[in-house]
Amino acid sequence: MALRDLLQLNEKRKKIGISEERIEAIKPQLRQYIAFWREYPDLFVDFLQTGGNPDIEPEFKFFAYQRVFLRVAMRYKYTYCVFPRGYSKSFLSVMVLMCRCILHPQCALFVTSGGKEQSAKIVQEKVQDICNKIPAFNRELDRRPGKTREGKDFVRYVFKNGSYFDNVAASERSRGLRRQGGIVEECVGVDGDILSTVILPTMNVSRLAMDGTRHDEETLNKSQIFVTTAGWKGTFSYDKLIQFLVWMVTEPEKAFVMGGTWRIPVLTGLQSKNFIQDLKNDGSFNDAAFSRDRKS
């Protein structure tokens, strides 16, 4: 049953308003929808485009690997993703934050990377791309003055349910902030000491639910998504990868590690095979650099 059916709406009826009584009457079904979408965010995005109507074809369609990425990132508290350029990893990571903000009211999330201006540009570009492809996301953002902000080195996206995510600097200036989860973008370039002593401790406090309670076991709380291309052994990012890999074996419900090569973007048409071949045929071709960038 589609949500519009629960609300008794269809194309032939004009929507006048949603009363408190109508919402109270369908609360059990709404809880089931939200619980389901938290596990299947790709289907939530499909729903935003079709309203649950099987006769409507969504304009934005996921590739199979993108659906896997979204589901893993939403279901596990600790996720480490090592993918090559052109894999849509930043696009999907920001989409995860937007889905979490919508489906977890009053949550506070972050994005950080080696440079604050770099993270601001990445987030702003991906949010605009997502909102253009799926306008329903844009309608969830609070665009009133003083709410959503977009600047050169700082962005904050506030949602109508009180949730928000922003970019935070990987520096001492971020000490004392409070968030429930976030993304470490291109973690291979982030200072490990700052990440351990400043950024990760911002997630000490769990999300305050709408009923005033906190649930430490909620996957959102202290959730960490590390996204990067391949780096080097003996670094903080490599040690973190090994830590998550061990947890994936010893505590499989807690952590997940994903990886991929240039072949998947080429197979799905996101990247040209001729471009990859030109890189290999270039006179300045460096096999080690190519392996890091394209064979993650």
Where are these regions (language model features)?
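Phosphate/NTP-binding elements of NTP-utilizing enzymes
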Residues: 2-295
